[in-house]
Amino acid sequence: MNFFEFLIEHLGKFIGYTAFANFTIGHLIMIIIGLTFIYLAIKKEFEPMLLVPIGFGILIGNIPFWGAEHIVSTDPQNLQIGVYQQGSVLNYLYFGVRYGVYPPLIFLGIGAMTDFSALISNPKLILIGAAAQLGIFGAYTAALTLGFSAAEAGAIGIIGGADGPTAIFLSSKLAPDLMGAIAVSAYSYMALVPVIQPPIMKLLTNSKERLIRMKPPRIVSKTEKILFPIIGLLLTCFIVPSGLPLLGMLFFGNLLKESTVTKRLADTAKGPMIDIVTILIGLTVGASTQATTFLTPKSVGIFALGAFSFMIATFGGVMFCKILNLFLKDGNKINPLIGNAGVSAVPDSARVSQVIGLEYDKTNHLLMHAMGPNVAGVIGSAVAAGILLSFLY
C-alpha cells in the first residue's frame, strides 16, 4: 500500500471521527443555548459565577463525536471522551454531581459565609422562608397533573426552592435521568430572579404596604450565633434526618464562621473550596445536557414548571407577610416586599426587596430585614428536600 492509498483509506475514517460528520440540528440548538448563557452572564451579569461554567459546559457536552453511545469502560469503541463515557476525565468529575457529592460541599461554603443574625433577632421571619416553599409543593402537584411520576414530580418541584445544589442533590436521588434539565432550570431561574419577582411583588402589594418601615433588628450576641447552628442542626435533622447531608454541612460551615477559633477553615470553605466546587458543578452539569437527552418534551415541561414554581414561591412569601400583618400591631408590621426573599436565591432575592423598596421610599432600606427570610429559605429548601426524599425515595 503506497502513501496515497493509505491516505485515501484513512481520510474517510478521520472525517467520520470529526464533529462535522456527527453534527445534528439538536447540537446546534444546544450550542446556541450555551452561548446565550455565556452572553447573559458576561453582558447582563446574570449570575456569572454559575452561568459561565454551565454555558461553557453545554458547549463541551454538545461537541459531537463518533462513538458517543459507547459508554461502558470495557467497550473497545469507548473513546473515553464524553461525560457519560466511563473512564473519561469528565465522567470522573461528573461523579460528584451524579452521586450528590458536590451539593453538601456547596452548603458547607454557604454556611461559612452566611450571617444568620437577621433571622436570630427576628425569629418570626423564618415563617416567611417556610411560606415561600409553597412553590416546591405547588410545582410538585402540577408535575403530577402533567403525568410525571411521583419521584420525578418531587425532583422537579424542588426547583421552586431556588437552590441549585438542593435541586441537584434531590434529583440525583429521585430522578437522575432528569437531573441535567432540573439543574439547568434551577440555575437559570435563579439568575432571572431580578426579572421574575418584581412584577409579582408590585401586583400583590399596595402603596401603603410598600412604605412600611420595620424596626431595626436587635444586636445578636456571640453566644446566640454559636448556639444557632447547633440548635438548628438538632431541631431540623431530628425532624427530617434525610436532609442531614445538606443541613449538617450548612450548620457546620456556620459554626466554623461564628466560633471565630476556626477562621482559617471558614475562610477555606467560603473561598477556594466553594469556588472550586462551583466550577466543577457548573461545568459538569452543563456538559451533561447533551442534545440527545436534553431536547425532549419532558425538558420543556420541566422549564415551564420551574417558572411556575418560582412565581408560586414568590406569591407565597409575599401573601404570607400580608396575612401575618393582620395579627401584628402597628410598629411591628412586616413590609411584604421582603416576602419574596423567602425564595432562597441568596442574596439575589433579598437585593430585589431592597431595590423595589427604594423605588417607593429612598430612605427605607429593606436589605437587612430581607436577609432573615432569605437565609431561612436556604434552611427551608433543604428541609423540604429532606421531606420529599423521605416520602418518595
Where does each model-flagged region fall?
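N-terminal alpha-helical transmembrane segments of multi-pass membrane transport
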Residues: 1-75, 85
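Structural signature of hydrophobic alpha-helical transmembrane segments
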Residues: 19-30, 91-106, 150-160, 187, ...
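Hydrophobic transmembrane alpha-helices of secondary-active transporters
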Residues: 37, 94-120, 253-256, 274-296
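Alpha-helical membrane segments and immediately flanking helix-loop junctions
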Residues: 95-100, 107-113, 128-138, 142, ...
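Entry/N-cap segments of selected transmembrane alpha helices
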Residues: 119-140, 292-318, 370, 374
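Alpha-helical transmembrane segments
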Residues: 177-195, 303-313, 337-341
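Membrane-embedded hairpin module used as a gating/binding unit in multi-pass transport
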Residues: 188-261
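Transmembrane helical segments that form the transport core of multi-pass membrane transport proteins
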Residues: 233-321
